Amino acid sequence: MNQLNTAIVEKEVIDPMAFRRALGNFATGVTIMTAQTSSGERVGVTANSFNSVSLDPALVLWSIDKKSSSYRIFEEATHFGVNILSAAQIELSNRFARRSEDKFANIEFDLGVGNIPLFKNCSAAFECERYNIVEGGDHWIIIGRVVKFHDHGRSPLLYHQGAYSAVLPHPSLNMKSETAEGVFPGRLYDNMYYLLTQAVRAYQNDYQPKQLASGFRTSEARLLLVLESKTASSKCDLQREVAMPIREIEEATKILSEKGLLIDNGQHYELTEQGNACAHMLYKIAESHQEEVFAKYTVDERKLFKNMLKDLIGI
């Protein structure tokens, strides 16, 4: 009889921080999950773990940390709401990502099935009956059966590499196809919003790979550039300037701090000498690309363009 040889294969130790950063390469939408118990306890949490499960029956899922104090209400409530945020709802996302006594204060919302809060101006919303709760490691996976949904069609808020993003057409899409030539140029190519989004897409397509090649992720590079420019005088201002959730700001600042690039002074963050050098390097990359793109325009044309952009932004 042959003796079977058995070997113990050691499992590779997964670094939670590195694992989370790797997962950040998968772009997702941003949702706020809401629920309310029969006694009137209301809860809302920002989540990007939302996904579809089944069409028949219509099932969706999301996950919540077992340590979350909000889980008790989702477990007790018979229904929950999925509010898919639009690109204009970054502040709402940040509000429900933070701990607060009453996140719903001064926020307009309607009540859906089971008295679930449904926010206005979202991209879409799903009213769900709690279907099942499954254990998944350090999270609870909450599955819901969709009983009603609302498709508002607004451009969604995206989340990628620890920062908020927006939808832009892929550069491989050729808008000058034979069938489109006689239809779109006269309308879309005279539309300022369309031209601005296409310009941003074209600019980012070549610029972002150069920035990522520096070794900094989008969230880290954005923080370095904003802090070096000193446009944010406090941590509260910083959140507005970088357009990132508090959790990601904290994670990125922790990484930059561990690299010796940043110091937390309590009310604000300050770059070290090495941090300023890295920010200067990132600015060189940005300025070089800017010069490359705008080389064919005169100084006066560039100045006019910048002034128009600043006027649109309100600065």
UniProtKB/Swiss-Prot annotation:
Pathway: Aromatic compound metabolism; 4-hydroxyphenylacetate degradation; pyruvate and succinate semialdehyde from 4-hydroxyphenylacetate: step 1/7
UniProt cross-references to InterPro entries, sorted A to Z: Flavin_Rdtase-like_dom (IPR002563), NADH-dep_flavin_reductase (IPR050268), Split_barrel_FMN-bd (IPR012349), WH-like_DNA-bd_sf (IPR036388), WH_DNA-bd_sf (IPR036390)
Enzyme class: oxidoreductase
Keyword Oxidoreductase: yes
GO biological process: catabolic process
EC number: 1.5.1.36
Keywords: Aromatic hydrocarbons catabolism, FAD, Flavoprotein, FMN, NAD, Oxidoreductase
Activity regulation: Flavin concentrations greater than 15 uM do not inhibit the NADH oxidation activity of the reductase component C1 but do affect the hydroxylation activity of the C1-C2 complex. Maximal reductase activity is achieved only upon HPA binding to the reductase component C1 before interaction with NADH. HPA stimulates the rates of both the reduction of FMN and release of reduced FMN from the reductase component.
SMART domains cross-referenced by the UniProt entry: Flavin_Reduct
Lineage top rank: taxon: Bacteria
A Pfam match: Flavin_Reduct
Molecular-function GO term, any one: riboflavin reductase (NADPH) activity
Annotated family: Belongs to the non-flavoprotein flavin reductase family.
Assembly description: Homodimer. The p-hydroxyphenylacetate 3-hydroxylase (HpaH) is composed of an oxygenase component C2 and a reductase component C1.
Role of this protein: Reductase component of a two-component system that supplies reduced FMN (FMNH2) to the oxygenase component to catalyze the hydroxylation of 4-hydroxyphenylacetic acid, leading to the production of 3,4-dihydroxyphenylacetate (3,4-DHPA). Catalyzes the reduction of free flavins (FMN, FAD and riboflavin) by NADH. Subsequently, the reduced flavins diffuse to the oxygenase component C2.
PANTHER family to which the protein is assigned, alphabetical: FLAVIN REDUCTASE (PTHR30466), FLAVIN-DEPENDENT MONOOXYGENASE, REDUCTASE SUBUNIT HSAB (PTHR30466:SF11)
Name of this protein: p-hydroxyphenylacetate 3-hydroxylase, reductase component
Protein species of origin: Acinetobacter baumannii
Taxonomic lineage from the root: Bacteria, Pseudomonadati, Pseudomonadota, Gammaproteobacteria, Moraxellales
Gene: C1-hpah
